Structure formats: structure tokens, C-alpha cells
């Protein structure tokens, strides 16, 4: 949940 710019890991 670190790349809240393109995906939601």
C-alpha cells in the first residue's frame, strides 16, 4: 500500500 498513485498493493 505504498503506490497509491496507480494501484492498490
Swiss-Prot record:
In-chain residues carrying the UniProt-annotated modification Phenylalanine amide: 9
Superkingdom as given in the UniProt entry: Eukaryota
Known tissue expression: Expressed by the skin glands.
Tagged with keyword Secreted: yes
Stored InterPro entries: Gastrin/cholecystokinin_CS (IPR013152)
GO cellular component term of the entry, any: extracellular region
Gene Ontology terms describing biological process: defense response; regulation of blood pressure
Location within or outside the cell: Secreted
Keywords: Amidation, Amphibian defense peptide, Hypotensive agent, Pyrrolidone carboxylic acid, Secreted
Main location: secreted
Modified residues (Pyrrolidone carboxylic acid): 1
PROSITE patterns, A to Z: GASTRIN (PS00259)
Family statement: Belongs to the gastrin/cholecystokinin family.
Function in brief: Hypotensive neuropeptide.
Protein's name according to its UniProt entry: [Arg4]-Phyllocaerulein
Protein's organism: Phasmahyla jandaia
